[in-house]
């Protein structure tokens, strides 16, 4: 399991992970930065299924499932 890396975009955190040499972004982080009121709805309505994965991460001793999106999914949320 890859570890999350956190970057800041205009002082807001963006969590990323690399899977098979491709960057993926935590969808919730991107949707919130872009101003979507409901991140889960934005990802469901705008990102194609082939551009998102549910990935399990371990944080603070707990496993959490997060929706991560690839670069194409990122552009789907932007445009």
Spans of model-derived segments:
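An anion-engaging/catalytic patch
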Residues: 1-79
